């Protein structure tokens, strides 16, 4: 039996998701833009999924029901790109300053880099040793020329929950976008001040290749993909009906009983962390110790997602530990899957002040509602063996 602890990279689809997708592929395959009954049937499926995902956003505390419009696209990366580049270009006549943090997902940072090449002024907000943004710096950077602020809700490498509600309250006349890919259906906390919210299906046990961008009513952005004007003209191209249907089912199921499910995940995460601390010496915990479902919170504020735990095993290489665990049927990550195949250290851990050696030994364990205490015993046992073996070999060099 495998132990899958790479749920921040992707998740296993719910069986109900696969079932509805198969039905759409076999029976409900009409083009939703067609004027016949098969087209209407597909359009109805999209409408229902939009309602399901919108309701899940509301349950997650990310937006209030009825405040905006949600349109489907290919995933979190496209959502981030569209929000950032679309908003910046639509509001350029009001200013040219854009603000984000050093710890964002590459989909955000690369969008900002492209806009900088096009003449926009970019400000990067620093983070502390817990990966939390410097609020004082953010406040000082916002001025009358600021047209967009983009800050993620939950960091995908450390699980740190950013104070986005507090940050959004400082926005003045700027638009505020949050990448909520790792928060959706996992961390219930209000970001009602956000103007745009990016989410993804495959992080919540839905299909890959589909995501959504929620936009508050009255906000106009320039679409990146032009054509037939689908998705209320925000995202042209024939909709991926099976994936959208699967996304709707996944959002409905993942958001149902979310608090109780995530409390269980938090308990498993805590058990794993305590086991590692007890059995393995010379580690650095890169995630805040306590999740948003535990009592020990800083000033009453949640610190970390219950799903993510990032630890550096000093004197080792994360990639070697990863493959050692893989041989035992345990699957973890050394960082974000979007960039973990590159031979560069994590930009997030570097911004937190970790040395190259500390970053090199980092492992990310990301849990889901299906992980168990018994699995964590197996993980700790095999992890200790792998770390001890590597350190012993290293000392013989």
Give the ranges of each region predicted by the language model.
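Pyridoxal 5′-phosphate
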Residues: 1-397
């Amino acid at each position: 039996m495998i132990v899958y602890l790479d749920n921040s990279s992707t998740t296993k689809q719910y069986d109900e998701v696969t079932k509805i997708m198969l039905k759409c592929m076999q029976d409900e395959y009409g083009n939703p833009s067609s004027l016949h009954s098969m087209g209407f049937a597909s359009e109805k499926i999209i409408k229902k999924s939009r309602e399901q995902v919108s309701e899940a956003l509301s349950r997650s505390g990310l937006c209030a029901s009825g405040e905006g419009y949600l349109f489907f696209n290919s995933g979190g990366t496209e959502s981030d790109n569209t929000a950032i580049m679309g908003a910046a270009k639509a509001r350029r006549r009001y200013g040219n300053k854009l603000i984000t943090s050093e710890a964002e997902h590459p989909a955000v940072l690369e969008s900002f880099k492209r806009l900088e090449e096009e003449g926009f002024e970019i400000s990067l907000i620093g983070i502390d040793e817990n990966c939390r943004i410097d609020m004082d710096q953010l406040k000082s950077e916002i001025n009358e020329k600021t047209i967009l602020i983009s800050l993620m809700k939950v960091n995908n490498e450390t699980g740190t929950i950013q104070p986005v509600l507090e940050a959004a309250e400082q926005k003045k006349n700027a638009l505020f976008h949050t990448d909520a890919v790792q928060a959706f259906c996992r961390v219930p906390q209000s970001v009602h001040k956000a103007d745009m919210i990016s989410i993804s299906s495959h992080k919540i046990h839905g299909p890959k290749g589909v995501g959504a961008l929620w936009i508050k009513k009255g906000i106009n952005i320039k679409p990146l993909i032009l054509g037939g004007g689908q998705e209320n003209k925000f995202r042209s191209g024939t909709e991926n009906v099976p994936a959208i249907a699967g996304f709707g089912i996944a959002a409905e199921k993942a958001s149902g009983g979310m608090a109780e499910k995530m409390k269980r995940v938090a308990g498993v995460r805590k058990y794993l962390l305590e086991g590692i601390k007890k059995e393995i010496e010379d580690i650095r915990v890169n995630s805040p110790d306590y999740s948003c479902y535990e009592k020990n919170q800083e000033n009453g504020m949640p610190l970390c997602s219950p799903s993510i735990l990032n630890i550096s095993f000093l004197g080792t290489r994360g990639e070697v530990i990863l493959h050692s665990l893989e041989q035992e049927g345990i699957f973890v990550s050394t960082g974000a899957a979007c960039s973990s195949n590159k031979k560069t250290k994590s930009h997030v851990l570097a911004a937190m002040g970790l040395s190259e050696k500390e970053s090199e030994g980092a492992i990310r364990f990301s849990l889901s509602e299906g992980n168990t205490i018994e699995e964590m015993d197996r993980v700790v046992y095999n992890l200790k063996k792998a770390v001890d073996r590597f350190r012993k070999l290293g000392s013989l060099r």
